[in-house]
């Protein structure tokens, strides 16, 4: 089973997105505290001020709340604007 943390930020100005994307590129550095997650970044189609970071954890990781890495990412992005941080899991297969 996989887990997905989605951290979205809404900036006050679209001009901040360049700095925000540069910061996100630095997030790709290896995570040294446990299994390394897969990271993907998305820009909103409808709003130039919205960016979303998707952190995908493999089945070996069990989360009951935001991960330490997710909390670190959220903290870094909070300087840019309003934050939404949600946790999703894949549904368990039925028999």
Task: Please tell me what each predicted stretch does.
Residues 13-38, 68-76:
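Short amphipathic alpha-helical segments
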Residues 4-9, 40-66:
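Short, well-ordered beta-strand segments in beta-rich or mixed alpha/beta enzyme
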Residues 37-52, 72-95:
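Glycine-rich beta-strand-turn "strand-cap" elements at beta-sheet edges
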Residues 8-12, 84-86:
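Secondary-structure boundary/capping motif
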Residues 12-14, 58-60, 92-95:
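Short coil/turn motifs at secondary-structure junctions
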């Amino acid at each position: 089973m996989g887990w997905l943390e989605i951290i979205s930020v809404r900036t006050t100005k679209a001009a901040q997105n360049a700095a925000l994307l540069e910061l996100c590129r630095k997030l790709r550095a290896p995570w040294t505290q446990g299994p390394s997650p897969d990271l993907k970044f998305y820009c909103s189609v409808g709003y130039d001020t919205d960016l979303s970071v998707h952190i995908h954890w493999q089945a070996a990781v069990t989360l009951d709340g935001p991960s330490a890495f997710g909390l670190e990412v959220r903290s870094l992005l909070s300087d840019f604007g309003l934050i939404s941080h949600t946790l999703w899991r894949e549904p368990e297969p039925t028999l």
